[in-house]
Amino acid sequence: MRCGKSRRFQPALIIALLVFLCSSVAGQDFDVIKNKVKEHVLGNGMKFIVLERPDVPVVSFHTYADVGSAQEVSGITGISHLLEHMAFKGTKTVGTKDFGVEAALLDQMDQLYAQLSREQRAVNPDSAKITALQEQFDKAKKAAHELVKVGEYSDMLDEQGGRGLNAYTNSDATQYITSLPSNRLEFWMAMESDRFLNPVFREFFEERDVVMEERRLGVETQPTGKLVEDFFAVAFKAHPYHHEVIGHMSDLRRITRQDVQEYFRTYYSPSNLTVAIVGDVKAEDVFTMADTYFSRIPSAPKPERLRTEEPEQWGERRVTVEAQAQPMLVVGYHRPDVNSTEDLAFNAMANIFGQGRSSRLYKILVKEKKIAVDAGSFNGWPGKKYPNLFAVYAVPAMNHTSAECMDAIDAELVKLIREPVSQEELGKYKRQTKKGLIDGMKPNSQMAQTLTFNDVVRGDWRKTFDAVKELETITMADVQAVAAKYLAKKNRTIGEIVPEKEGAQQ
């Protein structure tokens, strides 16, 4: 999500910005970089990770909230993503013309909406009462909107030279990013701490409508979106990876501002937040300011890790979406989480098997057999923190079917199980991945993201710098072993988009 006003950067500006945000790590030993990273945990449990890079006067900020759609329960699915939208609406002092008056109107709206919702869902709803309540609600909503300074939070950051303000939610986390000139460090501290200390979820109903429209456009009118939603629901019977980040429409319609406030109090406690700051700063300055600004946020226990585990699958599952759309095939095999000792082998297998035009799947299905226009594989679907899926997909070519693609995929999977990958394939994967790891450390923003991910999900930001050494330990036997262990038919779910049957909509 990009908050505030829409902007389109010209290519030249994008290139300039990337250069501006980059610091070269070429030729530096990873241990040298690792030794420059410092960490500090506030008394309330909030953690700050800092990497000093004085090359250019810019600093990137990455705030990682350890909460995603996997934390949601029935009735509030989609609330993590909705809260991400609400997090840019301002505070008691930012985004309002008169908070005292506005606060009273927001409370009035909450009360009216609760009454309206109860009456609408009553066994015998009173239509006259519903109409009266709706009129009162609309009047309060209009009055509250007139007090809003729309987009003030993002405008204030832009005025201070901010770039790349964004946020996104997935199954595992919600993350907030931006970059500022390095002499605006304290400005960011004041703004970000106020956002978590004094949030005001104004324009809630307007933003909820925006999210509902996202669902309509991305799921309810898109066969691919519908396939993904149904696929997760079938592949995961117990674990909350079974629902999409966007949530169910019936839940979105009924989520209240109080629901969001309660969710925020639970999952945005300081102990559940990790911040990485990379750029032209001094770690001691960062820690001093963090103590001043963020220690104001009251401490609270870190939410308990999810208890529910997905049970072993005992047989192949299938899901079909009928639509007048491009046919598609997706297959998912259950696999362990990112902290498993087998994760490295899974990554190598996904790359060799189905990533890029030189991968096995693409060469066989697209180039040689010409039964697909695209094919590939990937890991970590829909998340990485908990056991997830190794996925394979194919888009059948005209006059060809998903069944043909599935047969060809199965034939290649058998080879993967019975025969080790070649030394050439594994060597190519290691070289490409090593380059990607090094390149990924260049942009300040990407480095900040990697540090927070490794610290929260993998348990220690230092693992960022172990990746290349770990890469070298993968063997051909490791890849063959995970293929043989996990790529069984009884461990998979198959999803398809197929042509809609004649008369289906009549």
Residue positions per predicted region:
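Non-catalytic beta-strand/loop surface segments
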Residues: 26-71, 96-183, 205, 217-272, ...
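Bacterial N-terminal signal peptides that target proteins for export
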Residues: 1-14
